[in-house]
Regions:
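Bacterial Sec-dependent N-terminal signal peptides
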Residues: 1-27, 271, 604, 628, ...
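Short strand-turn segments of transmembrane beta-barrel domains in outer membranes
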Residues: 107-109, 120-152, 173-174
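Outer-membrane beta-barrel proteins
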Residues: 53, 57-59, 139, 169-188, ...
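Sec-dependent signal peptide cleavage junction
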Residues: 16-74
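Flexible loop and strand-edge segments within Gram-negative outer membrane beta-barrel domains
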Residues: 198-257, 282-292, 297-306, 354, ...
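Coil residues (strongly favoring Ser/Thr
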Residues: 27, 37-38, 58-59, 63-64, ...
Length: 640
């Protein structure tokens, strides 16, 4: 409440300043503390010298512009979440609207509800900057809390940089027992010698996520919710399945990647050796004060904890040659230890050591970049195999394209294989086949018709959760939530078509993203909407003698009806269901964005049509989507 008052005071003060001062523009910029744009100072370096790079991606630079793409990424994940369906509270899970996969032969990430929030080693940023950089992000939440993301990075010398990042969030939410909280700390460094013969990148990540789990609305509360009775506009009056359950996800990782140049010739040929080390611990737990009929009887106190510890060492050689291109050969040693019901004296698990070898190639020829990778498991049965091929056009014409093929096998996730709970009926040990995916893709970018992409995937041995049975637990007909694992023996055929294009009409623009997808299967094990669309119509202009740049408009989101997976908090995953379809409801947002110097301000009224279209909006069958809500925030960059 104090922040809201402060925000109103600032806005009111600005208005008073405009009314009273004969030079309102100067008074406006001075009133909010801007004297000189640090990057407009001719003595300071260009913004393009503030470099950002990840371990396996191209180098970019800090971008302080205000674009519609920045609006799409101004969220909890700080990623465009077009293909994800948010739950009602910040920090909760997301329901996937498309099928995606990790293009790796390593076992898939267990506990899918935590996957989107999890920061993996390829998500960590490294920096190389001429002056210290600070970035502050603030965004309001649903109720009683806030979301902040802070970054500080500096080069102590031309060759060494370190950065510290902290993301914190706490939000009570509007429904009972749905509080969420996050603490995420990232520390990264990178160093290269003056002659560029040696470089090393390191990072440490600590993530701690807490979610109060209510299991969704009861059947009676769903009826009350959809009735639009004014008594239940206060969502905390709706009954939920659990009032005393909490899940925790903790993760820590130590990572370094070092490379030494052994040979470099005048003709740009070079040979180097490298080593990547990664040690990671992951804990996922579900605690409940009293057992619930939704999961049956329990042998003792509900405190299910699953542990996963991994140590990986990758040794590689890299050859750069004008004739062969970039060639890399690597050897991976992967150690893992998995325990389920880890707090019990009778816990189960497995501990293994597996190895694989990989060969990668990248070469430019005839205005095209050719890249490929082959990885083969040598020892063990949980590492898979991988084959990637990609062709990119690299000419400077108005049309660019890429096409490729991915063929991989991988473990579906350790929790599909082995899981044990204090609930007597929630326990399994399975001998699963490796998931197999064949993916053929094509993408073309054109200034004329935008971006078009096509993916066609064949999926074999798809593992999934479903309910053990449809037994009821009370006179109201409530069905239990006891999960079990199954594996689809036939092939799932998946087609995805995506089109993105922005049309401009002077200072107005219409930004469009449309996804069409089709799934061919004998059983409904992969359930997705056929149509997803996002359309943003907005106006942008410089105002106050170019002291401020604004964007304002409406965003329309929609996905067609489908049998969405239901969130199951005990296993931190989703199970399939065929009883209730969700979707088919429009979501309309109104926004006003502004940029002053290096500060971007965001104001959004979310789901403004919620009271018009009726209470038929859900994130999963028993979890309602977000009501109308006004939120605001900012991103502020400092460069000295």
């Amino acid at each position: 409440m104090k922040f809201y008052c402060f925000f109103l005071i600032i806005v009111f003060s600005i208005n008073i300043t405009f009314c009273q001062d004969s030079n309102p523009i100067d008074s406006f910029t001075n009133s909010i503390g801007f004297k000189k744009d640090s990057l407009s100072n001719k003595n300071l370096p260009s913004i393009k010298k503030y470099l950002i790079f990840k371990n396996y991606s191209d180098t970019t630079y800090i971008d302080t512009s205000l674009t519609i793409k920045k609006l799409y990424k101004f969220n909890f994940l700080r990623k465009d979440n077009l293909e994800k369906l948010k739950f009602s509270n910040l920090g909760q899970t997301y329901n996937s609207l498309t099928f995606d996969f990790e293009n790796s032969s390593l076992p898939a990430f267990s506990f899918s509800s935590k996957k989107d929030i999890y920061l993996n080693s390829n998500d960590v940023n490294y920096y190389n900057i001429p002056t210290p950089l600070t970035e502050l992000l603030f965004k309001s939440v649903m109720k009683q809390g806030q979301f902040t993301d802070v970054l500080f990075s500096t080069n102590t010398s031309e060759n060494f940089n370190f950065s510290i990042g902290f993301k914190g969030m706490r939000s009570l939410g509007n429904y009972q027992n749905i509080l969420s909280g996050l603490k995420q700390f990232v520390f990264s460094t990178n160093y290269k010698s003056k002659n560029n013969n040696y470089r090393i990148r390191t990072h440490y990540v600590s993530q701690n996520l807490e979610n109060r789990e209510n299991g969704g609305l009861t059947d009676a509360s769903i009826i009350n919710f959809e009735s639009e009775d004014n008594l239940f506009t206060e969502r905390s009056k709706l009954s939920v399945k659990f009032e005393n359950a909490t899940s925790y996800f903790l993760n820590k990782r130590y990572f370094f990647d070092q490379n030494i140049l052994l040979l470099k010739l005048k003709n740009s040929n070079s040979f180097s050796l490298g080593h990547v080390f990664e040690y990671e611990t992951m804990y996922n737990s579900f605690e409940q004060a009293d057992s619930s009929d939704y999961y049956g009887s329990a042998s003792n106190q509900i405190n299910d904890k699953t542990e996963l510890k991994t140590v990986s060492n990758t040794f590689y050689t890299s050859l750069k040659s004008k004739f062969f291109g970039n060639v890399m050969v690597s050897y991976l040693n992967y150690n893992y230890s998995y325990k389920t019901n880890a707090l019990s004296t009778n816990h189960e698990g497995f501990k293994e050591n597996e190895n694989s070898i990989s060969f990668a190639l990248k070469k430019s020829i005839f205005n095209h970049d050719i890249s490929g990778k082959f990885s083969k498991n040598l020892f063990g049965n949980r590492l898979g195999d991988l084959l990637n091929f990609k062709l990119d056009s690299n000419n400077e014409s108005e049309i660019n394209y890429s096409l490729g093929l991915d063929i991989l096998s991988k473990h579906s996730g350790f929790h599909f294989e082995l899981f044990d709970s204090a609930y007597e009926k929630v326990s399994w040990s399975n001998d699963l086949k490796l998931l197999k995916i064949k993916n053929l893709f094509f993408k073309i970018n054109s200034n004329l018709f935008g971006s078009l992409s096509l993916d066609y995937r064949l999926i074999d041995n798809l593992a999934y959760f479903e309910l053990l049975n449809n037994d009821t637990i009370n006179n109201e007909g409530e069905v239990n939530l006891i999960p079990k694992v199954n594996q689809y023996e036939n092939t799932v055929k998946y087609l995805k078509f995506k089109w993105q294009k922005e049309f401009r009409f002077g200072k107005f623009a219409l930004d469009n993203s449309i996804i069409y997808q089709s799934v061919s299967q004998d059983q409904k094990v992969l359930n997705l909407p056929n149509l997803i669309t996002r359309n943003t119509f907005y106006y942008s202009n410089n105002v106050f003698k170019r002291a401020m740049f604004i964007q304002t408009g409406f965003t329309f989101n929609y996905f067609s009806k489908y049998f969405a997976d239901e969130y199951n908090p005990l296993i931190s995953s989703f199970h399939i269901q065929s009883e209730k379809k969700i979707g088919g409801f429009p979501m309309l947002d109104f926004f006003v964005n502004a940029k002053i110097k290096q500060t971007r301000l965001y104001f959004k009224a979310e789901h403004i049509n919620s009271s018009i279209t009726g209470n038929s909006f859900y994130s999963s069958p028993s979890y309602p989507y977000r009501d109308f809500l006004i939120r605001f925030g900012l991103v502020w960059n400092f460069f000295n």
